[in-house]
From Swiss-Prot:
InterPro entries linked: HCP/CODH, Hydroxylam_reduct, Prismane-like_a/b-sand, Prismane-like_sf, Prismane_a-bundle
Cofactor dependency: [4Fe-4S] cluster; hybrid [4Fe-2O-2S] cluster
The encoding gene: hcp
Example of a GO cellular component annotation carried by this entry: cytoplasm
Name this protein carries in UniProt: Hydroxylamine reductase
Length: 542
């Protein structure tokens, strides 16, 4: 049986990748990821069946987060590291199994494999299509993808020292439920919304972790040009990795630039003390093939999004860490205290040319909830006076599809009395357009990374309170969200849990939504796709 994966927005034909992932993963990697996920579901089943307290599982919780993170789109393409993780998690599962009644356990809790060949054979029977009913399958996958996004955010918070036992408990509960054939469509819909509830909790946890460690994001002008020093490019999302690299590059003559979703690191006060933290290089993740060539220096991937490099020269400059991985790229492990030695990257940087300049100027961001609340009086007055007619939440992800030019055109054609609220790499479609300001309020307010969509929800709820409204949907806020991978799924489910309706989701609706599940989302929540820029703006402004 060939691979089957439809977890990302770019899945082939909007239906599923069956030969090779559009992301670049091959059949073997896809199947190993399926088996790793199934193994984690087996652990979740044992935890749930045995009423095991997640608070007592310590490192097992961390390995579960890492395993789930490894299966997110564009995180890990390294078949060897995924196989190693499967073996590790099977050992964890088998040890845990000793504490529960052995009879009648689900296959996920008892299956065994002893070779790569047997792993791939087993994966054939446990992938997405092993659930026959398409509506049950659709809901199970939506919950699973939401949990993957939740695990990514929980791992980042854990790396900063913030954990929540309730989030671990829910991850086990939700994944175990995807193995339970007694659950109905209604049961799974309820669990989908509960996944959104825990999505809000995990984003709040990560927000607390980031701000307690690095300070509250503040309005910041970020340089997009270059200097003449050798440099390292940091991509992904993990701020603790960036912090360690900046500490280790102090005084070395090596500059550090952010890439993609790491851009918002510049907004945190703690990172402003590093004089070699120069700026942001390039654009959204999918443009990296060309931009990595012109950067010249080493690239450190702390998480997704990795695009398979097309040349050996670039591959030799790519390093991975955490849950990320790519064959042939050096992986930097943490020691038992979470410390990482980046000296090899730094020494390589010293031997390579400085980056080529691909653009000049600066961009402004740092509009997370604390900063926007500090401007609340100005924002409220702008709404009351009519200077600002509407806010557009255009958070989410960017991607390769040509149809994503819609978001650039949408931003360009919005009436001048509207403001865009954004988070995630979707911002790159319009954050360099120079859309101006309204009475000193920039027309693009960037809150940060994809998880900082939490900030946008906090801002909306605060505005609801300020204006004395009983429903978030009565605010002059429209949601036009771009999605790509599983972290966007947990953000979407969180918004649905908070009661947000009439979200437009694009550039295409998820391939994992069955017609019946999509129908319920449309009828109950008003979820819609995108149309033409002109028609959508008319609809939103009416």
């Amino acid at each position: 049986m060939s691979m089957f994966c439809y977890q990302c927005q770019e899945t082939a034909g909007g239906k599923g990748c069956t030969v090779r992932g559009v992301c670049g993963k091959n059949e073997e990697v896809a199947k190993l990821q399926d088996l790793l996920l199934y193994t984690v579901k087996g652990i979740s089943y044992i935890v749930t069946k045995g009423n095991i307290d997640a608070a007592k599982l310590g490192n097992t919780n961390h390995e579960v987060l890492s395993s789930l993170f490894m299966t997110i789109t564009n995180v890990n393409f390294d078949d060897g590291s995924i196989e190693k993780q499967i073996r590790k998690m099977l050992a964890v599962r088998d040890e845990m199994k000793k504490s529960v009644q052995a009879e009648g356990l689900h296959d996920a809790a008892v299956f065994s494999v002893d070779s790569r060949e047997s792993m791939l054979k087993k994966a054939d029977s446990v992938g997405v299509l092993s659930t026959q009913n398409e509506d049950i399958r659709s809901l199970r996958e939506m919950i699973t993808y939401g949990v993957k996004g939740m695990a990514a955010y929980a791992e980042h918070a854990k790396n900063i020292g913030k954990e929540d036992k309730e989030i671990y408990s829910f991850i086990y509960e939700a994944l175990a439920a995807t193995l339970d054939d007694s659950l109905s469509v209604d049961d799974l819909f309820a669990l989908t919304l509960k996944t959104g509830e825990y999505g809000v909790k995990v984003m709040a946890l990560l927000d607390e972790a980031n701000t307690s460690r690095f300070g509250n994001p503040e309005i910041t002008e970020v340089n997009i040009g270059v200097r003449k020093n050798p440099a390292i490019l940091v991509s992904g999302h993990d701020l603790t990795d960036l912090e360690q690299l900046l500490e280790q590059t102090k005084g070395t003559g090596v500059d550090v630039y952010t890439h993609g979703e790491m851009l918002p690191a510049h907004y945190y006060p703690a990172f402003k003390k590093y004089d070699n933290f120069v700026g942001n290089y390039g654009n959204a993740w999918w443009k990296q093939v060309e931009e990595f060539e012109s950067f010249h220096g080493p690239i450190l991937f702390t998480t997704n999004c990795i695009v398979p490099p097309r040349s050996e020269e670039v591959r030799r400059r790519i390093f991975t860490t955490g849950s990320a991985g790519f064959p042939g790229c050096k992986h930097i492990e943490a020691d038992e205290n979470g410390k990482k030695d980046f000296s090899e990257i730094i020494e390589l940087a010293k031997t390579l040319p400085a980056p080529d300049e691909i653009e000049t100027g600066s961009i402004v961001g740092g509009f997370a909830h604390n900063q926007v609340m500090a401007l609340a009086d100005k924002v409220v007055e702008a709404v009351k006076s009519g200077a600002v007619k509407k806010f557009f939440v255009m958070a989410g992800c960017d991607g390769r599809m040509k149809s994503r030019s819609y978001y650039t055109e949408f931003a360009q054609n919005l009436p001048k009395d509207t403001v865009i609220l954004t988070a995630g790499c979707a911002k790159y479609r319009y954050n360099k357009l120079g859309l101006g300001d309204i009475g000193g309020i920039p027309r693009v307010l960037d809150a940060g990374q994809c998880n900082d969509s939490y900030s946008l929800a906090v801002i909306a709820l605060k505005l609801k309170e300020v204006f004395g409204l009983d429903d978030i949907n009565k605010l002059p806020i429209a949601f036009n969200i771009a999605w790509y991978e599983q972290k966007a799924v947990i953000v979407l489910l969180a918004l649905l849990y908070l009661g947000v309706k009439n979200i437009h989701l694009g550039p295409t609706l998820p391939g994992f939504l069955s017609p019946n599940v999509a129908k319920v989302l449309v009828e109950k929540f008003g979820i819609a796709g995108i149309g033409t820029v002109e028609d959508d703006i008319k609809l939103f402004m009416s």
